[in-house]
Design a protein with these regions (language model features):
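Basic, nucleic-acid-interacting segments
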Residues: 1-296, 313, 334-338, 348-351
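Amphipathic alpha-helical core segments of compact helical bundles
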Residues: 16, 231, 326, 330, ...
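C-terminal non-catalytic interaction appendages of large macromolecular assemblies
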Residues: 143-148, 186-193, 202-205, 412-476
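Core structural elements
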Residues: 189-201, 306-330, 339-357, 369-371, ...
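Extended hydrophobic-aromatic, low-complexity segments
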Residues: 280-281, 316, 328-330, 341-342, ...
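Extended, non-catalytic structural segments that build the interaction scaffolds
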Residues: 287-293, 330-335, 341, 371-383
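Extended, structured, electrostatic nucleic-acid-contact surfaces
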Residues: 299-306
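Strongly charged, low-complexity linkers/loops
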Residues: 361-372, 376, 382-455
């Protein structure tokens, strides 16, 4: 019997504001002593009243627009009631009945090249919980994270397999990263994902019983958990069993999901309107201001790079994959006035260094203006491409004007015809066999003589002039 998988993803994304969502406590919870970035509001003390951080609302709107959502001009906060040590109030302020954003869509392309669209059901503003640190004998709680602003992005159950889930998460992460509203790092905990998985017989329209899997600390873990849970549920059904609606925990070490608790229904949380916060009213002016701040996203940028800079699809996709890398590239283009050479340098030399040093483009020490100037020196025949690579290596430790480096190191390209002639004559005199080989029709001999000439000039001779001079002498 054939089955199909139905997947919905719930993504929690921390917003990168300076202060928490309901109070003025510092939101940079990891760089503080435990339980020091707290106040009566974020620890739920009696009588303490929350107030919405306006920056949270702007960031939330920006994220929703990036994901193609409709913005509700009026929305409300609600209380989700439950008891757990990481929630000091014994409830979470969220948006259940009327979220601020709904009905989004994300276009994705899988690694195998398949295109699809995944609907986003809703996005809601809520607060994070305290951070639990589990040891062998106890659980420690750091309330610095309590009330750090979150948005929860809930997809529609339209993802068909683990490959699509991976593409959805990567696309979502890339678009949110471009808005700069979040670090979107699963490693740092600013992006977290729960996977809802169910299976049904192929052709059926009714959804199967779903499970929710937590503790997914990477996109690869999400993929593995979905694949495991799909196979587990199919096996249960094939053996005549019944899938239990429950929350399961991903065990990374053993690559399995394990039961955690029975899955709660909405009624279990006794949602009711938050009495201490007014409705969110999003004005036309506010929405317009946020729209004006929206960036050009990676897919849009890639298309422009292809049209404007005549790059191929792979080059454009790589250069636009990160906003900072795209900005670096365009600054090199601006200074060098050569999009082709700029792309070559960024895609080869610069990405090589980033990979070797395991750093981001923001941490790269060489300013884009200096790469642009280096390219201009090549175009002006001041230095050869080979010497340019030597200058680049110097730039990695001495980030200064490449023109100064070239002058200080005596690296200016030899373009004087008489000097070129002397170099070529010496090489021909020292390599009579190669001269005979060339005259006998062996084309590789010319490459050898070129190489010897460049070596004699220590890479400083103009390659084109060397080549022309060798040919002239051999045919003369």
């Amino acid at each position: 019997m054939e089955y199909e998988t139905v997947i919905g993803l719930e993504v929690h994304c921390q917003l990168k504001t300076n202060t928490k969502v309901w109070c003025s406590c510092d939101a940079d919870y990891d760089n503080k002593e435990p339980n020091t970035a707290v106040c009566p509001i974020c620890t739920g003390q009696p009588g303490a009243l929350p107030k919405l951080n306006e920056k949270v609302l702007d960031y939330a709107i920006k994220a929703a627009l990036a994901l193609g959502c409709e913005i509700n001009r009026e929305s409300y906060f609600d209380r989700k009631n439950y008891f757990y040590p990481d929630s000091p109030k014994n409830y979470q302020i969220t948006q259940f009945f009327k979220p601020y954003a709904e009905n989004g869509v994300l276009k994705i392309t899988t690694n195998s090249g398949k295109e699809a669209s995944v609907g986003i059901e809703r996005i809601q503003i809520e607060e994070d919980t305290a951070k639990s640190i589990h040891t062998a004998s106890e659980t420690l709680l750091n309330y610095n994270r309590a009330s750090v602003p979150l948005i929860e992005i809930i997809s529609k159950p339209e993802i068909k397999n683990a490959e699509e889930a991976y593409a959805y998460l990567n696309t979502l992460k890339d678009r949110l990263k471009y808005t700069k509203v979040s670090d979107v790092s699963m490693e740092l905990g600013s992006l977290r994902c729960d996977a809802n998985v169910s299976v049904r017989k192929k052709g059926e329209t009714k959804l199967g019983t779903r499970t929710e899997t937590k503790n997914l600390n990477s996109f690869k873990a999400v993929v593995k958990a979905i694949e495991y849970e799909t196979n587990r549920q199919i096996e249960v059904l094939e053996n005549g069993g019944r899938v239990v609606q429950e929350t399961r925990l991903w065990d990374e070490e053993n690559a399995v999901t394990k039961p955690m608790r029975s899955k709660e229904e909405a009624m279990d949380y006794r949602y009711f309107p938050e009495p201490d916060l007014p409705a969110i009213i999003i004005t036309e002016s506010r929405l317009s201001n946020v729209k004006d701040e929206m960036p050009e996203f990676a897919d849009e940028k890639a298309k422009r790079f292809i049209n404007e800079y005549k790059l191929n699809e792979m080059e454009a996709a790589t250069l636009s994959s990160e906003q900072e890398l795209a900005e670096y590239y365009e600054e090199v283009v601006k200074v060098s006035d050569d999009a082709r050479l700029a792309a070559n340098w960024v895609l080869t030399e610069i990405l090589r260094v980033l990979k070797e040093k395991n750093i981001s483009i923001e941490e790269f020490s060489v300013e884009p203006q200096n790469i642009g100037k280096l390219i201009k020196l090549i175009k002006a025949n001041t230095i050869s491409s080979k010497i340019a690579k030597d200058v680049f290596e110097i730039l990695l430790s001495e980030n200064k004007d490449p023109e100064i480096i070239v002058k200080e190191k005596g690296l200016v390209q030899i373009t004087d015809n008489s000097e070129i002639e002397k170099i070529v004559e010496q090489v021909l005199a020292e390599n009579p066999q190669s001269v005979e080989d060339y005259k006998a029709g062996k084309s590789n001999a010319l490459k050898y003589l070129m190489g010897q000439s460049m070596r004699l000039s220590k890479g400083k001779a103009n390659p084109k002039m060397i080549n022309e001079m060798i040919l002239a002498k051999l045919k003369g």
